[in-house]
Amino acid sequence: MAGAIASRMSFSSLKRKQPKTFTVRIVTMDAEMEFNCEMKWKGKDLFDLVCRTLGLRETWFFGLQYTIKDTVAWLKMDKKVLDHDVSKEEPVTFHFLAKFYPENAEEELVQEITQHLFFLQVKKQILDEKIYCPPEASVLLASYAVQAKYGDYDPSVHKRGFLAQEELLPKRVINLYQMTPEMWEERITAWYAEHRGRARDEAEMEYLKIAQDLEMYGVNYFAIRNKKGTELLLGVDALGLHIYDPENRLTPKISFPWNEIRNISYSDKEFTIKPLDKKIDVFKFNSSKLRVNKLILQLCIGNHDLFMRRRKADSLEVQQMKAQAREEKARKQMERQRLAREKQMREEAERTRDELERRLLQMKEEATMANEALMRSEETADLLAEKAQITEEEAKLLAQKAAEAEQEMQRIKATAIRTEEEKRLMEQKVLEAEVLALKMAEESERRAKEADQLKQDLQEAREAERRAKQKLLEIATKPTYPPMNPIPAPLPPDIPSFNLIGDSLSFDFKDTDMKRLSMEIEKEKVEYMEKSKHLQEQLNELKTEIEALKLKERETALDILHNENSDRGGSSKHNTIKKLTLQSAKSRVAFFEEL
């Protein structure tokens, strides 16, 4: 009895110990998430959960990546998660990354979240130098990355040194030139300031449009050997298969677009490619590992499917997504226009306020100056009045002295002088008295004139005082603020109506909206052509400007190859591949075998 109870207890405890779930950590380009997954879950169950959590509908570009012995692998959708060769230590870690790249990012990437994830991944690949980017293009891409993060450039906010902690340029580019971080920031900021008005999603899309023209964008490279044992590189991307020299990952030697390939298969380490034309012999190559062949096959199948899908009509789901994206873009555009109008009106109101404050300050200064002038006039008038009074008193005193002298002269004349000497002395005194009297009279006349002049100056000073008081009165009675026209309230934006019926989404535009949007689209096309030409000129100008600061001895092999391509008038990546496919598939296969 006791033994049976013990066996039941041990069985139940064993049953409790068996886990029903396991923990998974998902690492995206800008976040980490953890999920509890059921033991029976397949790769598709986990992948769908991650996509739902991110709100991502363009799932066909992405996958869950893990590493096996330094080799990249992708989670298979139809296989249990724990049946993969992954670490059994929890949490089991996967990286949510773009597995396949679009041919044209602007046309194919519909959702904003899709664009954002691609932007982050491509930016990291450029900074980690997994994608070669020439120096002048690196500066331009950095300016769009700054616009996406910081918004419009504002000199009062984005002061010198605000990019000091940002990783914006590949280390290879920084080491290639004798330039300080401040010099790089100055050049990045000069372009950043030109991107005013671009929203985050627009700046990120501009980044991708430039990056997708880089030679190594979206290419997965694998070391292979042909029948002769020559070491080569196989490049797999959205356009097809490309064969490279191991020392030159920029320009393929030959290319096979997906529409020329009928079948792809491998056996052990040998890979077989069957061209669409059955008259052409298959061509084979060997890879280093069986696991690598599995990865090559996955990438070939996925890229081929997307290549064919792009050349067919969009599915209903994609059509709905694109319609919804257009509606969302139109709504955001209208919202941005409304905000721009409000911002413009606010700036105008602030300018009007600043002008009024300036005029008020000016009027205050004028009033202060008028008061000071009035005070000086009053002081001058007081001084002149005092001086006139003193002069008048002096004139009276001189007149009194002159009268006394006259009286003295008369008294002397009336006095009888008996002797001739006394008479002569008396005549001399009389003469002196007359001279003194004449001087006194002249001085008195001069003082009188001076008093008259002072009275006239006093009258003028009082007139100046009256004018100063009048001006002060005029300033005081002026209106402080000029009449302002009332600022009209922002008009409500003409937001289109959204009607959701079942799974269908309808979008109604007014005729005026459609005409306006058509005009804006046409205008954007013209502006884009002008900007493209201007952009190339700017890139060439920057390249010339910093060329003198380049340290030639630090150039990498890819730098040298890129410069040689440029010197030969190198064309774009797509044009290069197009030229390589002008030869017949048969001659290209033969060329591959002879490499």
Curated annotation (Swiss-Prot):
Q: From the record, what ranges are coiled-coil?
A: none
In terms of InterPro entries, this protein maps to: Band_41_domain, ERM, ERM_C_dom, ERM_FERM_C, ERM_helical, Ez/rad/moesin-like, FERM/acyl-CoA-bd_prot_sf, FERM_2
Q: What is the effect of changing residue 518 to D?
A: No effect on phosphorylation. Defective nuclear accumulation. Significant decrease in binding to DCAF1 and in ability to inhibit cell proliferation
Q: Which UniProt keywords apply?
A: Cell membrane, Cell projection, Cytoplasm, Cytoskeleton, Deafness, Disease variant, Membrane, Nucleus, Phosphoprotein, Tumor suppressor, Ubl conjugation
Q: What is the effect of changing residue 339 to F?
A: In sporadic meningioma
What residues does the FERM domain cover?
A: 22-311
Q: Any keyword 4Fe-4S?
A: no
What mutagenesis or variant effect is reported for residue 273 to F?
In breast ductal carcinoma
Listed name of the protein: Merlin
Q: Which organism is it from?
A: Homo sapiens (Human)
